[in-house]
Amino acid sequence: MESVDNNSFFSRIRNSNAYRKVKDFVILDHRPGMTMAERMLTNKDLYPVPPSKRLWGPWNFISFWLADAVNINTWMISATAIELGLNWWEAWICVWVGYLICGILVATTGRPGAVYHISFPVLSRSSFGTWGSLWPILNRSVLACVWYGVQAWIGGECVVLMIRSIWPSFSHIPNTMAKSGTETYQWVGFFIFWLLSNIAIWFPVHQIRHLFTFKAIVAPPAAIAFLIWALVKAHGAGPVIHEPTKLGQYEHAWVVINGIVTCIDGFATLIVNNPDFARFATTPGAVHWPQIITVPLAFGVTSLIGVLVSSASKAIYGTTLWDPTQLLASFLDHSNAHGVRAGVFFIAFGLCIAQLGVNIAANSVSAGNDLSALLPTVINVRRGGYIASIIALCMCPWNLLSSNNNFTTYLSSYSVFLSSFAGVIIADYYFVRKGLIRVAPLYSSSSSSPYYFWKGINFRAFASYICGMLINIVGMAGSTGQKVPKVANTMFNLNYFLGITVACLSHIIICKIFPVTECGEKMLSEVPEEADDYLLTLASEDSIDKDSTSEIYIDGLPTEKEVEKDDVLSITSKKLSGCFP
């Protein structure tokens, strides 16, 4: 009798208006007739980008990287190499070489997204398998959430400088958070930056290109103004640029290699998640030279400004301040003049926008795409971005960045895992499948799908990934302070190169021994129409189902029916245009 009452109670809850409203809000819309397995592979944000949303042209990618280059990490990228003994121009050459390689790699990983208009989570299904792709997606989503918090804390330091410029006493407010390991004024700056980031997360990816355009207008002039101010204040470039190399020939070579790899390690996330942006490209060519040229140019100039400003800081204060926020804080500590405060405010504002842009690009968007792919029935890109934001707030990033914490070393070393993922994806797309991807099967849970492999897992990709990871794992332990053989530490100087090369070659060899299906006959046997054909099929099925309210959604925002109709018509006209003389 009690069981009947319980069933009746739960039945009343399920039939209540409140329950239905909550369910309708939490559960994302899906196309009718889909099985639960199919719903776990699709949602509005995972579909290929329709023509009306392919708005990123070459200049958008150029402005994206011009904006992304101006950030505090890039500003300080040469510091390690110089402190290890290189002179400034040797460290700068390392930066140019490192970021040139990064530009080539992001163009390489971005091309599949630009051709088929699919994100990294969907692309990884073609190499790791329908369900096996969840492993690289999970890895990258965790890393993106952690880095989101770290970058937000750095952005908060810029906000603190802006507030101090207006109210100099702000840094002296009572500390009510001593037990939390931080100062109240620092936490307030972090929280304000965190709130501002949440506004940017609301907008879909095809629209936030305007944020990067704004950042490209604001951040570089702020960096140049900072450089001029520091050089004038120091009456020159300072002593750092006159310091000679302090290394022997053998050590010199390895420090140069380490300087190059350090740049690539910091780019590891962007190399993997470039399809998340490239999918919005107007043409595949928009992701090639604009990225290959702009990345080393923009990041090289930013690092040079960082070296010159830091060198000037030594002439001004007797110590080299590599962190620009510390130097700006020193300006405020030594002068209360209105001109100094105004200058610090506007430069800090530029750096704040720079940090906001890099956090959205490298962490928020990638976390949103990844979390959306992990649980597509309830998470879209927007919700995923907000989940990452909440995780970042809860993990107390100030503790992770404390001087006695090795966590930042672990974060930097994590690139050995991402390099293996990149190696497998590059090998699979360019050398195994030769650019041929069937888009529709990427969203199918059927065992007949060419990407289902064994129970949805491609053992070839995982074997290759493990090979690329294992060659670096001992050196990674050494980088965190563990005792390991000297040769492992030496090899770890090549960590990204080793990881991506071993994973790439292993995948090519294994796929030669155990061939996969659906491969092109020659290099770049791409079929760009695959994405449009799949979208056209979805639109046709929806039009047949008269009662369906299902639509194709992009970036968490439903497209208007008129826009959807234009998308279908543009696809149809493209297909029909070849049928008439």
From Swiss-Prot:
Query: Where exactly are the transmembrane stretches of this chain?
Result: 62-82, 88-108, 143-163, 185-205, 212-232, 252-272, 292-312, 342-362, 384-404, 407-427, 461-481, 496-516
What are the entry keywords?
Answer: Membrane, Phosphoprotein, Transmembrane, Transmembrane helix, Transport
Q: Which GO terms describe its biological process?
A: nucleobase transport; uracil import across plasma membrane
Q: Which residues carry this modification: Phosphothreonine?
A: 572
Q: Which GO terms describe its cellular component?
A: endoplasmic reticulum; fungal-type vacuole; Golgi membrane; plasma membrane; plasma membrane raft
Where is the protein situated, by its record's location annotation? Membrane
Q: Which GO terms describe its molecular function?
A: nucleobase transmembrane transporter activity; uracil transmembrane transporter activity; uracil:monoatomic cation symporter activity
Q: How does it sit in the membrane?
A: Multi-pass membrane protein
Q: Mind telling me which Pfam families this protein's record contains?
A: Transp_cyt_pur
The keyword Phosphoprotein appears for this protein: yes
CDD domains linked to this entry? SLC-NCS1sbd_NRT1-like
Domain of life of the organism encoding this protein = Eukaryota
Its family?
Belongs to the purine-cytosine permease (2.A.39) family.
Q: What does this protein do?
A: Transport of uracil.
Q: Could you identify this protein by its name?
A: Uracil permease
In its UniProt entry, the species of origin is given as Schizosaccharomyces pombe (strain 972 / ATCC 24843)
**Taxonomy-wise, where does this protein's organism fall, top ranks first?**
Eukaryota, Fungi, Dikarya, Ascomycota, Taphrinomycotina
